[in-house]
Every structure is written in structure tokens, then in C-alpha cells.
Design a protein with these regions (language model features):
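Compositionally biased low-complexity segments, especially N-terminal hydrophobic helices
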Residues: 2-14
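Intrinsically disordered, low-complexity segments enriched in glycine/proline and serine/threonine
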Residues: 2-5, 113, 184
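Phosphate/adenylate-binding glycine loop and adjacent helical scaffold
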Residues: 11, 15-164, 168, 174-179, ...
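Short, hydrophobic/amphipathic alpha-helical patches that form generic packing surfaces
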Residues: 170, 181-192, 241, 267-276
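Short, solvent-exposed segments of well-ordered alpha helices
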Residues: 173-174, 258
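Acidic, carboxylate-rich catalytic segments that either coordinate divalent cations
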Residues: 235-284
Length: 284
């Protein structure tokens, strides 16, 4: 892709604001992934900082250089999400504010497995609804990259997959560019239906990881790095593990409600990956 809208880059560290709330109420954790729990407990002497604050989520740049996304009760919206009993009150948290392990109370938290289990689909790929997503993916350049991604997956060509995915990473605008969402969806299908395939091609996997680290936003970076390791948000897991056409339709509608177009773009990648892998099997 020769012309690409510039992804909105978030700084990897935020300066401390001139004033901070004196005390942050304890953050009672209800649910989190096992990997996130390990991250919370690691290196307790170091400090994290609030990265960005939204109405329904707070991103924390943790001391390992990657994000934790705090949100209220419900399904984990990211593989690095932490579902709290309630979010801090508006105005009590600001970008740059220090946050440490002792701010969290995870003693009674449910540990959630966010790794994609391998196995066949319990639904027809054509049962996944189609919804127009971001304009970037529907542009000629976006369509060419999506087609190249599908061809690489269908052919079992890890280099072609990586070429197409690298072209999509950072393509589009927003906190998670449309191209990144599409790649994430395709990786979810790969981990479900072709487990170990990408891991067996370490050079191509490393190319994707490097593109995630250098070509997109902080939030999209961490979604993609987690996806390369086989970890996904609960709504994405619910789609790939659905046991019937009706259930996958319900799960897909929940994903479609995510963000302005992120859900549709992720679903585009899931559908693309599932169809491509079905085509690969049919040719054997």
C-alpha cells in the first residue's frame, strides 16, 4: 500500500500532570486474564502510569511497557483488559497519574483463559454477518491488501500472509486502525483452525511483531502482539468457539457493537480467515 492514512500514534510514556488526586480508591478486580494477573504481580517496586482516559475505559501504561485496559463489569474487551467492580469516578484519574500494584485488589478475581482453543468451527463461515466497516478497508488499496491476506492464508504461504498483514498494520485511523482490526480477526481464525502454523514460521511472525511495535498505535500494538501469542478478547473468542449458526450470529452482533467500526473490521478479518482456511482444507 503506497498511500496510507497516518495512524494516530499515542506516546509510550505520558508526562505527569502538575496536580494529581491525593488518593485513588482501591480498584476491586472482578475478572482478568491469567497473563494480566501475572503482569500485575510482577516487579511490584515499579510504577505504571495512566495512559488515556475514556468514558468507559482507562488505559494504563504498565511497568512492562504495555497497556492494561480497565473497564467495568462484563466480558473482557481486550486480552489485556481488567474488569473492575466499578471504574474510578470521573475526574479522579488523569493521564500521567501514577498507579501501582497495591491500587488493585484482585484477591477474589476470576482468572479467565483468553487463549484461543484450537478446533473445528461449529458454524458455517457464511453464517457470519457482513457489515460495512471503515472506509479504509473498502478503498482500492484496502481491498487489494485484504485479498492478498486471504490468498496467503488459503495457500498456506506464511510469507504472503505476513506481506499482506504488514501492509494492513497501521492502515486507517483511530485508536485501532481498520487494517489492524482486520489482521487481528484473521489471526483469530488462524489460531482456531491452523494452530501452530504461524508459530512454525518464526521469521514471518517476527516481521508481524516488529510491524505492530513500530507502525501503529499503542493500543493496536498490544492487541496484535497478544493475537500473535494466541490471546484474544472474550467477544472474539465467543465468535470462533460458537457451536451453531444461531450462536455465532449472536456473538457477531456483540462484536459489531464495539467501537465505531472496529467490530465490523474485526469481523471482516474473522470471516476472511475462516473462508480462506476452509478453501485450503478443500484443496487437500
Amino acid at each position: 500500500l503506497k498511500a496510507r492514512p497516518t495512524a494516530t500514534m499515542m506516546p509510550s510514556a505520558m508526562p505527569a500532570p502538575p496536580e494529581q488526586p491525593a488518593v485513588l480508591d482501591p480498584l476491586r478486580v472482578m475478572r482478568l486474564g491469567s497473563a494480566s494477573l501475572e503482569r500485575l504481580a510482577r516487579e511490584p517496586e515499579k510504577t505504571g502510569r495512566v495512559h488515556s482516559v475514556f468514558e468507559r475505559a482507562i488505559n494504563v501504561l504498565w511497568r512492562d511497557g504495555h497497556l492494561l485496559t480497565l473497564h467495568g463489569p462484563g466480558p473482557l474487551a481486550a486480552p489485556f483488559a481488567v474488569a473492575l467492580e466499578r471504574l474510578p469516578t470521573r475526574g479522579s484519574v488523569a493521564p500521567g497519574m501514577s498507579i501501582e500494584s497495591w491500587n488493585f485488589d484482585w484477591r477474589d478475581a476470576e482468572r479467565v483463559a483468553l487463549e484461543m482453543p484450537d478446533g473445528p468451527l461449529g458454524f458455517a463461515a457464511d453464517a457470519l454477518p457482513e457489515r460495512a466497516g471503515a472506509q479504509a478497508l473498502r478503498s482500492p488499496a484496502g481491498a487489494r491488501a485484504r485479498q492478498a491476506l486471504a490468498r496467503g492464508i488459503a495457500a498456506g504461504d506464511a510469507r504472503a500472509l505476513a506481506d499482506a498483514a504488514c501492509a494492513l498494520i497501521g492502515f486507517g485511523e483511530g485508536l485501532t486502525p481498520a487494517g489492524d482490526d482486520c489482521v487481528l480477526g484473521a489471526l483469530a481464525a488462524v489460531h482456531r483452525l491452523a494452530p501452530g502454523w504461524l508459530a512454525a514460521h518464526t521469521g514471518q511472525r517476527d516481521r508481524l511483531a516488529e510491524a505492530a511495535r513500530t507502525r501503529t498505535t499503542d493500543l493496536a500494538r498490544d492487541f496484535l502482539l497478544e493475537a500473535l501469542d494466541g490471546r484474544f478478547a472474550e467477544p472474539v473468542l465467543a465468535i470462533l468457539t460458537a457451536l451453531s449458526d444461531d450462536l455465532v450470529g449472536d456473538a457477531a452482533r456483540r462484536v459489531l457493537a464495539m467501537g465505531a467500526s472496529s467490530g465490523a473490521d474485526t469481523l471482516c478479518g474473522i470471516r476472511l480467515g475462516c473462508r480462506a482456511l476452509e478453501a485450503r482444507v478443500a484443496r487437500r
